[in-house]
């Protein structure tokens, strides 16, 4: 068997990225999940992780990268809306970011949480896709 046949297809790789976005949104959309993350990883600055992880998965060229049919048009629209709020939040908050308990009081952080919740709701219409096989449709 050649090594090229072991490499996942582009679609499967995009499905994995999509699943990672769902994981991210589940944390960004929930103050409780953020606090749980902080408890489980006390050495991690969760506010920074929540703010910066989005950029790890969604580049400035995301419209060309996060393609249909892996990402539905509804999901792409939800990303556009969340990206706008994320960018505003990213540009508004002071650095270094305060501790999680304090940043959760900030209006910009609260708006980010609501936007993440809205985006997640759209993604969960289809839920997570396979990490190993191409999803149909």
What residue ranges belong to the model's regions?
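Short terminal alpha-helical segments
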Residues: 1-61
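Positions within ordered alpha-helical repeat solenoids
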Residues: 30, 88-91, 122-125
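Structured alpha-helical bundle/scaffold domains in large eukaryotic membrane-trafficking regulators
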Residues: 94, 124-135
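Intrinsic low-complexity, intrinsically disordered or marginally ordered coil/linker segments
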Residues: 1-3, 131, 137
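Amphipathic protein-protein interaction modules
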Residues: 58-118
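Short, flexible helix-adjacent loops and helix caps
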Residues: 33-37, 94, 98-101, 128
